[in-house]
């Protein structure tokens, strides 16, 4: 007995149940349960046998659930007279009307499997009911008196008076549901009109996904949008020059919109170039926080799809959402993976279309025009570790191209203080001397050193102990201060992640294409 076959049949049964094909789903569930029962006879390991018994029990519950759904649906089809046992307070004329209609219902010989459109399944013998209603027209007016309870038995006659009575009464039953649906439709409009102002008054506005798949919009809002990154300039160590350039290019145009007009218009985009781990993503989040914009954190996975034309639609949807939530900041991390140079031999037609759409959309977000508000500005930030692979057209649109270097000694010391603010330190520790030993380390490398050094005391305390003894160690004994020796040992374990040859390449590219 193949386990893969059991998994496949279980998957098919669940898929058919989700699609509403319950009969086929039951067949698959029955087959799976029989397969598991046969498999249990050949399993002799107690633990494995217990696992399969648990799986069989869970699948049996799913099978019973689908079976109950099928039974309920069959009840709707096979019992058209189910609403007859109505409450005792129903009016008598309806019961007479039904008795008069029942003999007529048996006259025509119809195929029970054929449903006469456009009426529901419960109204299969519709022609006899209509004839019965025409023979006895006074009966149709009688039920309109107890209109509050009448609509439940609309099989006796489906004339206009019933529907008008149902709409006025708002009673229960199927006929009443149709009448109440009309009221709901009319009331739904008023409800929307009432809700619209309250939505506008709320703290957040909702993007209207008209023309787009609702799932695409929800995925972008869930995975990309960050309305409050909560990262400030003080949370980033060093990079004083980069902060100043970003503030001038992104933040100041929102603070002084009257000044940044004409030739002083805001930049179309900013490209941050530098080795990995230098804080490019943190700078982008700080920009979004300082200027109070909606932050879109985009990667290549967010804008690619296996379906033809779907990736271009995602790019267009991203920029439309950014304009809707404006002022916005679109941060495209590792932009070289999306917009590498065009015309290369390894380029695919789909990726070329995505690049073209991205370039077109970036040309359309160059900032507010003369007739637009400054609050509608969309700023594009991009980061890359391989600036020499970026397409020339994209490089032109990213007008500011700044270099994010490795932290200097002051930045390294500040980063040590930020990372160790919640870690107890020994009195004889000197962070400046430790920072001097970290020359050539990136921000991510320094963070790894701090993490490793902060765990040294715990490692010494639990060395040679069994798990039961480790569980009973008091928290105070584990949280011992970190010593200079811990940092020296951590520096021996954590090496640099950026080589000198890479730094030379970055500096050469900035000398040729930099725009600071």
UniProtKB/Swiss-Prot annotation:
Residues 168-178 have a biased composition (Gly residues). Residues 75-212 are annotated as: Disordered. It is found in: Cytoplasm; Cytoplasm, Cytoskeleton, Microtubule organizing center, Centrosome; Cytoplasm, Cytoskeleton, Spindle pole. It catalyses: n ATP + n H2O + a microtubule = n ADP + n phosphate + (n+1) alpha/beta tubulin heterodimers. GO terms for molecular function: ATP binding; ATP hydrolysis activity; microtubule binding; microtubule severing ATPase activity. InterPro entries: AAA+_ATPase, AAA_lid_3, ATPase_AAA_core, ATPase_AAA_CS, KATNA1, KATNA1_MIT, KTNA1_AAA_dom, MT-severing_AAA_ATPase. Keywords: ATP-binding, Cell cycle, Cell division, Cytoplasm, Cytoskeleton, Isomerase, Microtubule, Mitosis, Nucleotide-binding. Its EC number is 5.6.1.1. The keyword Nucleotide-binding applies. The keyword Zinc does not apply. ATP binds at residues 274-281. GO terms for cellular component: centrosome; cytoplasm; microtubule; microtubule cytoskeleton; midbody; mitotic spindle pole; spindle; spindle pole. ATPase activity is stimulated by microtubules, which promote homooligomerization. ATP-dependent microtubule severing is stimulated by interaction with KATNB1. Residues 133-143, 155-167, 179-212 have a biased composition (Basic and acidic residues). GO terms for biological process: cell division; microtubule severing. Belongs to the AAA ATPase family. Katanin p60 subunit A1 subfamily. PANTHER family: AAA DOMAIN-CONTAINING (PTHR23074), KATANIN P60 ATPASE-CONTAINING SUBUNIT A1 (PTHR23074:SF19). Can homooligomerize into hexameric rings, which may be promoted by interaction with microtubules. Interacts with KATNB1, which may serve as a targeting subunit. HAMAP family: Katanin_p60_A1. Catalytic subunit of a complex which severs microtubules in an ATP-dependent manner. Microtubule severing may promote rapid reorganization of cellular microtubule arrays and the release of microtubules from the centrosome following nucleation. In mitotic spindles this could allow depolymerization of the microtubule end proximal to the centrosome, and subsequent poleward microtubule flux. This is Katanin p60 ATPase-containing subunit A1. It comes from Strongylocentrotus purpuratus (Purple sea urchin). The gene is KATNA1.
């Amino acid at each position: 007995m193949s386990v893969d076959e059991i998994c496949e049949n279980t998957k098919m049964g669940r898929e058919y149940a989700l699609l509403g094909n319950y009969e086929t789903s039951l067949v698959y569930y029955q087959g799976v349960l029989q397969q598991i029962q046969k498999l249990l006879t050949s399993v002799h390991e107690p633990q494995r046998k217990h696992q399969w018994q648990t799986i069989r029990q869970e699948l049996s519950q799913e099978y019973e659930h689908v079976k109950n759904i099928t039974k309920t649906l069959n009840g709707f089809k096979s019992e058209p007279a189910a609403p007859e046992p109505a409450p005792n307070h129903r009016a008598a004329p309806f019961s007479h009307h039904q008795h008069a209609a029942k003999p007529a219902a048996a006259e025509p010989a119809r195929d029970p499997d054929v449903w006469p459109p456009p009426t529901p399944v419960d109204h299969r013998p519709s022609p006899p009911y209509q004839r019965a209603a025409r023979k006895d027209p006074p009966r149709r007016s009688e039920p309109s008196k107890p209109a509050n309870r009448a609509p439940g038995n609309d099989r006796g006659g489906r004339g206009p008076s019933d529907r008008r009575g149902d709409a006025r009464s708002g009673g229960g039953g199927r006929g009443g549901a149709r009448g109440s649906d009309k009221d709901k439709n009319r009331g739904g409009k008023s409800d929307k009109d009432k809700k619209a102002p309250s939505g506008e008054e709320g703290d957040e506005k909702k993007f209207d996904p008209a023309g787009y798949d609702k799932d695409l919009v929800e995925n972008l809002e869930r995975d990309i949008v960050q309305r409050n990154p909560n990262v400030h300039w003080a949370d980033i160590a060093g990079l004083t020059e980069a902060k100043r350039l970003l503030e001038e290019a992104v933040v100041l145009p929102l603070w002084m919109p009257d000044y940044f007009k004409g030739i002083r218009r805001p930049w179309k985009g900013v490209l941050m170039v530098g080795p990995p781990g230098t804080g490019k993503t943190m700078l982008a989040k700080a920009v979004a926080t300082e200027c109070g914009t909606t932050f879109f954190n985009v990667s290549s996975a967010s804008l690619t799809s296996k379906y033809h034309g779907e990736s271009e639609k995602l790019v267009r949807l991203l920029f439309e959402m950014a304009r809707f939530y404006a002022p916005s900041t679109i941060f495209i991390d590792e932009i070289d993976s999306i917009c590498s140079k065009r015309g290369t031999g390894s380029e695919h037609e789909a990726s070329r279309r995505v690049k073209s759409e991205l370039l077109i959309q970036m040309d359309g977000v160059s900032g507010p025009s003369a007739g637009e508000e400054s609050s509608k500005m969309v700023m594009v930030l991009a980061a890359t570790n391989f600036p020499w692979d970026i397409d020339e057209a994209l490089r032109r649109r990213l007008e500011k191209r700044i270099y994010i270097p490795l932290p200097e000694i002051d930045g390294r010391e500040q980063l040590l203080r930020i990372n160790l603010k919640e870690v107890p330190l020994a009195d004889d520790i000197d962070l400046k001397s430790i920072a001097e030993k970290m020359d050539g380390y990136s921000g991510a490398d320094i963070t790894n050193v701090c993490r490793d050094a902060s765990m040294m005391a715990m490692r010494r305390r639990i060395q040679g102990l069994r798990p039961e003894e480790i569980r009973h160690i008091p928290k105070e004994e584990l949280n011992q201060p970190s010593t200079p020796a811990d940092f020296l040992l951590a520096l021996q374990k954590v090496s640099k992640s950026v080589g000198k040859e890479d730094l030379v390449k970055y500096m050469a590219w900035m000398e040729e294409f930099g725009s600071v």
